[in-house]
C-alpha cells in the first residue's frame, strides 16, 4: 500500500489516531501489507499475495490450532472474538 493510500485510509478509518502514529505502527507490524500474516513462533514460506489467499492461509492456520496475527495492524487471532473480528473481515484494511 502506498503512502497516500495509507494516509487516506487512516483519516477515514481512524481519525482519532494521529497519522504519524498509525504510520509507525503499521510500518513495523506489516510493512503496509494488508494481507500480512505473522505466525507466532514460526513463519510462512511466503506471504499471501491477495485477500483470498490470505483468508485461505489464515483459515488453515486456525484449523491447525496455530497462533497468528493478521493484517495491517497484526491483530492476533486470540483477540478476534473480543473485537468482533472474523478470519475474513480482519483482512479489511479499515476494520483492521
What residue ranges belong to the model's regions?
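Catalytic glycan-binding domains that act on GlcNAc-containing polysaccharides
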Residues: 1-96
Amino acid at each position: 500500500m502506498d503512502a497516500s493510500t495509507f494516509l487516506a485510509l487512516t483519516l477515514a478509518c481512524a481519525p482519532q489516531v494521529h497519522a504519524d502514529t498509525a504510520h509507525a505502527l503499521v510500518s513495523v507490524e506489516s510493512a503496509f501489507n494488508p494481507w500480512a500474516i505473522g505466525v507466532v513462533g514460526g513463519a510462512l514460506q511466503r506471504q499471501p499475495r491477495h485477500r483470498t489467499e490470505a483468508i485461505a492461509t489464515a483459515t488453515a492456520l486456525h484449523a491447525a490450532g496455530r497462533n497468528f496475527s493478521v493484517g495491517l495492524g497484526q491483530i492476533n487471532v486470540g483477540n478476534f472474538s473480543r473485537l468482533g473480528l472474523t478470519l475474513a473481515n480482519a483482512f479489511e484494511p479499515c476494520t483492521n
